[in-house]
C-alpha cells in the first residue's frame, strides 16, 4: 500500500508540483490548502508523513505542529517543514517544536523525495525497506508478508515486528529488555516475560519451513537470530 502523505501548502502551483512528484515516486498525496483543511484531514487513514508549509491561511505551521503533538493519535506522525524561511533561528524553532526535518524553497524533487525517505527510515524503518531474505525466509515490510520459500507464513503483528528486528540485526544477542525497547518501544510498559510469549509464538509461526531454529535462546542473556544452528 502506498504511503499516505499530507501536503499542507497554500500556494497551488507548489502544492500541485509536490503532489505530482510524490505520485511519481509511489506515494499517495493528500492536499490541504490552509490550516483548517489540514486539521480536517487528520483522520483515518492517518497520514504516514506531513509536508507542512510555515505560513498558512488561518494559522501557522508551528501552531499546526503543536496541535498534532497535543493529540495522542497524531503526535507521532513525522513532519517535514516546507518553507521559504531559511534562517537558522526559524529552522531551530521548527525542529524544537516537533518537526523532524526542514527543507527550504526552492528545492529539487530529488531532494524532497530523499528527505521524505530519510525521515521515514528514522521514524518507521519498515515503511521504505526492501524485501529481507535469509536462508529461504523472506519478509516484505510493505505488504507485511512472510514467506518460507513459496509458502506464506501466518503470524501476528507483534511477531512480525519481532522477526523484522531479528532479520535486520542477525547474529547478535539481545536481552529481553533490549528487545522490549526496540520492538515495543520505550513508552510502553510490558513485563520482560512478554518477550518469551511472543518468541514462542514466532517460533511456532516459523516451524512450517524449519526456520524456528533460527530464533535461538542464549542462556542467561536473551535471544539471537542466527543462520548457524
UniProtKB/Swiss-Prot annotation:
Q: Which SUPFAM superfamilies match?
A: CheY-like
Which PANTHER family does this UniProt record tie to the protein?
PHOSPHATE REGULON TRANSCRIPTIONAL REGULATORY PROTEIN PHOB (PTHR48111:SF40), REGULATOR OF RPOS (PTHR48111)
Q: Which residues carry this modification: 4-aspartylphosphate?
A: 53
Query: What name does the UniProt record give this protein?
Result: Phosphate regulon transcriptional regulatory protein PhoB
Q: Name one GO biological process term.
A: regulation of DNA-templated transcription
Q: Which CDD domains match?
A: REC_OmpR_PhoB, trans_reg_C
What does the UniProt function comment say about this protein?
This protein is a positive regulator for the phosphate regulon. Transcription of this operon is positively regulated by PhoB and PhoR when phosphate is limited.
Where is it predominantly found?
cytoplasm
- GO CC terms, sorted: cytosol; protein-DNA complex
Q: Which NCBIfam families does the UniProt entry name for this protein?
A: PhoB, PRK10161.1
Amino acid at each position: 500500500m502506498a504511503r499516505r502523505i499530507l501536503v499542507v501548502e497554500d500556494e497551488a502551483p507548489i502544492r500541485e508540483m509536490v503532489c505530482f512528484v510524490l505520485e511519481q515516486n509511489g506515494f499517495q498525496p493528500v492536499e490541504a490548502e490552509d490550516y483548517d483543511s489540514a486539521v480536517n484531514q487528520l483522520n483515518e487513514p492517518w497520514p504516514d508523513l506531513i509536508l507542512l508549509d510555515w505560513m498558512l491561511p488561518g494559522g501557522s505551521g508551528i501552531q499546526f505542529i503543536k496541535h498534532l503533538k497535543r493529540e495522542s493519535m497524531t503526535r507521532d506522525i513525522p513532519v517535514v517543514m516546507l518553507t521559504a524561511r531559511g534562517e537558522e533561528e526559524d529552522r531551530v524553532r521548527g525542529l524544537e517544536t516537533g518537526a523532524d526535518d526542514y527543507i527550504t524553497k526552492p528545492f529539487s524533487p530529488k531532494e524532497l523525495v530523499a528527505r521524505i525517505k530519510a525521515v521515514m527510515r528514522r521514524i518507521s524503518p519498515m515503511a521504505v525497506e526492501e524485501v529481507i531474505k535469509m536462508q529461504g525466509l523472506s519478509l516484505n515490510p510493505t505488504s507485511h508478508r512472510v514467506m518460507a520459500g513459496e509458502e506464506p507464513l501466518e503470524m501476528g503483528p507483534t511477531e512480525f515486528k519481532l522477526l523484522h528486528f531479528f532479520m535486520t540485526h542477525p547474529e547478535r544477542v539481545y536481552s529481553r529488555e533490549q528487545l522490549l525497547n526496540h520492538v515495543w518501544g520505550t513508552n510502553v510498559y510490558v513485563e520482560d516475560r512478554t518477550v518469551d510469549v511472543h518468541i514462542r509464538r514466532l517460533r511456532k509461526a516459523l516451524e512450517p519451513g524449519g526456520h524456528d531454529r533460527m530464533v535461538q535462546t542464549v542462556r542467561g542473556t536473551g535471544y539471537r537470530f542466527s543462520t548457524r544452528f
